[in-house]
Amino acid sequence: MTTRVTLISPAMNPAVREARFDDGCSLDAAGAARARSAADEVRPAAAALVSPAVRCRQTAAALGLHVRDEPALAGLDMGRWRGLTLDEAAAREPEALARWLADPAARPHGGESVHLLCARVGGWLDEAARTSGRLVAVVEPEVVRAATVRVLGAPEDAFWRIDVAPLTATAFTGRAGRWNLAPGTALGRTDRTPAERPGR
């Protein structure tokens, strides 16, 4: 029994362009257009899921996916740092930010810790591995990071060393309790053959 999970990061929005923690803003025009152009690159799946975030919902709609909410795949709750840049958080609470970046269990912003996020996403992956077929989900970049940490059996501080670009598809294939990872593939390009498209 093989399970294939494809996690798609959302397209560009102002928070990404300005390097801010997401604050619920919509996709910008370029991000929405790129997502629409990628609609035929996403293969049909037995189930299509989405993070509750606005930019994830809008990306899923632009891709033509008929999705249902999956709370277990929600993004990291940044508490009172929501909408701030890293520099702004550092200026307001330098010691708290340093602690957060150094300790996956820390949550000085009053939201969710990286440790809790990794546990939540890892639990969802464990459940997904009990089913066969193809799943696709549009999720926040930090969810892709957390899934990668779990699949590779990496320490949680490796979370910070994983980059996830906007509108990329990362595939995880699970069988007999073991996952394999196919690194993120950019969507919305026109210079790939059908065989190179994500999920092939």
Protein language model features and the residues they cover:
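Short beta-strand scaffold positions
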Residues: 50-51, 119, 138-139
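Phosphate-handling substructures
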Residues: 63-120, 183
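Glycine-rich phosphate-binding loop signature in dinucleotide/nucleotide-binding domains
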Residues: 42-44, 128-134
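Acidic, low-complexity terminal tails and accessory targeting/binding regions
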Residues: 1-4, 38, 76-88, 149-200
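Conserved histidine-centered catalytic loops in small-molecule metabolism enzymes
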Residues: 42-72, 98, 173-200
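GST superfamily/GST-like fold recognition
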Residues: 141-145, 174
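Active-site-proximal alpha-helix that buttresses catalytic centers in soluble enzyme cores
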Residues: 2-68, 110
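Generic beta-sheet signal
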Residues: 5, 131-142
